Amino acid sequence: MAKQNTKRDFLVALMNNKSDFRIAKEQNWYRIPCSTKMMPKSVANKTLKYIAFYHTKIFNKDAYSVRWFGEVKNISVVKRKMLFPEITNDPKAENEYYKIEFNSLIELPAPIISNRPRRLLFISTTFGHFQNAKNINDLFYGSPIEEEFWKAIKFENIEAERQYLINTDEKLFYLDFAIFCKERNINIECDGDRFHLSEINVKRDKNRNNILSSLGWSILRFTTEDIRKNIHKTLGYVKETINRYGGIEIISDKTYRYFKEDNNQINLFDY
């Protein structure tokens, strides 16, 4: 059996401009400013093999979805004046960009949808994740325990957003999992033993918890053992917390769902 490719050589990039999408479809290239702070590694080291585009609300009926992708041919660093020679007196003319060139874009038979409107800059993932994704959250390729936890909550029909961005006055936070409830939202973090249990990261996590709590979030943290050896108990904590905060929000039908404690089946209540 062939070994599954686990390299993050597939990039889903933000597409928030119709003229840029026209360039992507007609001229087969996309640009990223070299000054971008969160530059995908696969772009910087030129190992990117595929690129897809996440459309924002400007695309109307195609908003918040991934519908097009292409195979990357070349990545180069060029100045803006080379990308847009027709623009005169451009104050950004000397700015440098990664120019990602690709084969003709291919339209997916069925789009990958985000149920909740989200602004996503980049998702670095694998071709396998892209092939199997039905929802935008399926695209994310996290740590092994994050992947295991995602499969577990999907099986239990617990709707969550992965790598959900919280922008505060102090800094940006990406939540491993965000669950939206009627009374209070829940942040779930999967704490790998090696990283999160070191002294410096324990202090960082406590500070992070305090900031999120002040914003009204409830935080649950689970270790590798919680997820790999005690997943049934861990999911029980999650369901109890959801029930405590008024049920989980279901975007598609604007309802809230509770979980029964006796048989783990979902009960639906409309508000």
Predicted regions and their residues:
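Basic, glycine-rich
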Residues: 182-183, 200-271
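Structured alpha/beta reader/binder surfaces that contact nucleic acids or chromatin modification marks
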Residues: 2-139, 143, 147-161, 167-171, ...
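Residue-identity detector for glycine
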Residues: 70, 128, 142, 192, ...
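Short, Lys/Arg-enriched charge-dense amphipathic segments
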Residues: 87-91, 104-111, 186-194, 242-250
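Arginine residue identity/basic-tract feature
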Residues: 8, 22, 31, 67, ...
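Generic domain-boundary/flexible-linker signal
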Residues: 81, 113, 188, 198-199, ...
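Surface segments flanking catalytic/ligand-binding clefts of nucleic-acid enzymes
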Residues: 138-214, 218-228
